[in-house]
Amino acid sequence: MRKIKLIAVVGPTAVGKTALGIELAKTFNGEIISGDSQQVYQKLDIGTAKASKEEQEQAYHHLIDVREVNENYSVYDFVKEAKVAIDTIISKGKIPIIVGGTGLYLQSLFEGYHLGGEVNQETLMAYREKLESLSDEDLFEKLTEQSIIIPQVNRRRAIRALELAKFGNDLQNSESPYDVLLIGLNDDRQVLYDRINRRVDLMMDNGLLDEAKWLYDNYPSVQASKGIGYKELFPYFSKQIPLEEAVDKLKQNTRRFAKRQLTWFRNRMNVEFIMVGEENYQQKIKRKVSDFLSSK
């Protein structure tokens, strides 16, 4: 069976994924699938850096605003709904372009491992999500408990080994139906960090404080409230810290998150990054996409 061609734009927060995704969608007759765990939530627009209405008018976006704020969203939900979106886009004769920085979601969509049956697949992904939330120390402690020997530097192999130990022969390795062109965006670290700091300031100017206060007042304990951009402001609302300290914490957490994203994509998905500071970087990417789409 011929594989479905997908384009995936990945990289750290604030690097310019949204803008590139829209440009590629306009150039190659594509539609965008958001690969972000927070952008699924309605009414949370500023803190999630959701594509603006003007940007969404330039290219159709899937998996944005598909959950109420008080609903949970899992990697299983994403994979299931992303597959539907891919089929919908393909049926229109268009190119699916996945844009996002939630690495576990993208990896789970692209790879071929699965358990038989829909309920079992949900079980696998829930277990994987639980393992991913563990620290390195806790993860390798689980390996030790089960007498599994894995190099401590390799989280991916560790998680796969634990999945195999839990599910055994029920864990099947089928070929992925997707042929994916991974486009990784990166920038000089200090330039990226400066951009993150400026973006947080712009978010505050655009009403992030009010958006976070609404979430704090109405849904302080839901999954969505745990996201970066909201949880840092909650201590300010409860009068534990001044606003300046909360904003500084938000900037710091976002920078750390960007670093973790880069590490994930490098180590877990073998992404080769293109520096957005390079001259004509978008033209280079467009040539890669054109060659990919024209190949058999």
Curated annotation (Swiss-Prot):
Residues that hold ATP according to the record: G11, P12, T13, A14, V15, G16, K17, T18
Molecular function terms, GO-annotated: ATP binding; tRNA dimethylallyltransferase activity
Cofactor: Mg(2+)
Any matching Pfam family: IPPT
Name assigned to this protein: tRNA dimethylallyltransferase
Gene Ontology annotations of biological process type: tRNA modification
Region (Interaction with substrate tRNA): 36-39
Matches recorded under PANTHER family: TRNA DIMETHYLALLYLTRANSFERASE
Native source organism of the sequence: Streptococcus agalactiae serotype V (strain ATCC BAA-611 / 2603 V/R)
Catalytic reaction equation(s): adenosine(37) in tRNA + dimethylallyl diphosphate = N(6)-dimethylallyladenosine(37) in tRNA + diphosphate
Positions of the record's site feature: Interaction with substrate tRNA: T102, R128
Residues that, per the record, bind substrate: T13, A14, V15, G16, K17, T18
Protein family membership: Belongs to the IPP transferase family.
Catalytic activity, EC: 2.5.1.75
Function: Catalyzes the transfer of a dimethylallyl group onto the adenine at position 37 in tRNAs that read codons beginning with uridine, leading to the formation of N6-(dimethylallyl)adenosine (i(6)A).
Keyword ATP-binding attached: yes
High-level lineage: Bacteria, Bacillati, Bacillota, Bacilli, Lactobacillales
Quaternary data: Monomer.
Keyword terms: ATP-binding, Magnesium, Nucleotide-binding, Transferase, tRNA processing
